[in-house]
Structures are given as C-alpha cells and as structure tokens.
C-alpha cells in the first residue's frame, strides 16, 4: 500500500499519532578527485577558500533544509548534526550523522547533508578539476548511502 498516495492524489503521511522516539542516522558518500586537487585541499591552496570547512557548513545547512527540498519529508527538530571528512590520496569521504527525537526517521536529512557537502566540494575545486577542454574527467560523486540507522 502506498502511504503517500490516495484517490485524491499525493499527500504527506499523517504522523501525529506516532510517538516521539530518539533516532540517529549516519550516511556517507565519496568524491573522487585528482591527487593534485587533494594536495591543494590539504595545503588550503584552493582559490575559493577552505574547502572542507565550507562543505561542512553546507552539509549542516542542507540537513536543516531537507524538508524544503524533498516534497514528502516532514519538518522535524534536529538535535544534532555532525559532518566529517576522511581525505584519501584520490578521494574524500563525507560522513553525516544526524540525531532527533521525533515521530519519523531522519535518513533523508543525513543523505541530503552528505550530498550537499560533496557537491560543495565539487563547486569549490572546479577550477582545479577541469581539464584543458573544460571537462571533468576525474571528478565523480559516488557511494552515497545510509551506513547506520538507529531507533531507540
């Protein structure tokens, strides 16, 4: 049975009768970059500024805006957001952990946080990643997924 569709059309599910429950979700994803770009990020030599700090802020903001971006997501009280990065030779892993005590899950918030953090990295390093024809031969976002979902 589809919970978001009835004979009148699309609707948002009524969660008013559900109890508040502590929920935690961790999502991750990767961006593949040229090793030279990773070096510039580590040395903080990217022209637009500090890549990882900017991406961290963007990821946090994205979590808080998820309900405005995804039509069937409920606005919910976010009690904690953490966006971290692991930097490898040719890629960066973004990890977004989100916590709430509410009636519905926070998977979409964690996934949105990771996605926007990775997109922000791409935006920050565009000039370093383009080849002589203006193409992105190396840059790739991949592996976005929910790593862990906890409902207490």
From Swiss-Prot:
Family from the record: Belongs to the MoaC family.
Enzyme kind, highest EC tier: lyase
One biological process term in Gene Ontology: Mo-molybdopterin cofactor biosynthetic process
Binding positions for substrate per the UniProt entry: 72-74, 108-109
InterPro entries listed in its UniProt record: Mo_CF_biosynth-C_arc, MoaC, MoaC_sf, MoCo_biosynth_MoaA/MoaC, Mopterin_CF_biosynth-C_dom
MF (Gene Ontology): cyclic pyranopterin monophosphate synthase activity
Domain of life where this protein originates: Archaea
Lineage of source species: Archaea, Methanobacteriati, Methanobacteriota, Methanomada group, Methanococci
NADP is among the record's keywords: no
Protein's name according to its UniProt entry: Probable cyclic pyranopterin monophosphate synthase
Function: Catalyzes the conversion of (8S)-3',8-cyclo-7,8-dihydroguanosine 5'-triphosphate to cyclic pyranopterin monophosphate (cPMP).
Subunit structure: Homohexamer; trimer of dimers.
Catalytic activity: (8S)-3',8-cyclo-7,8-dihydroguanosine 5'-triphosphate = cyclic pyranopterin phosphate + diphosphate
Pathway membership: Cofactor biosynthesis; molybdopterin biosynthesis
Keywords: Lyase, Molybdenum cofactor biosynthesis
EC number: 4.6.1.17
Keyword Lyase: yes
Chain segments annotated as transmembrane: none
Catalytic center residues: 123
Source species of the chain: Methanocaldococcus jannaschii (strain ATCC 43067 / DSM 2661 / JAL-1 / JCM 10045 / NBRC 100440) (Methanococcus jannaschii)
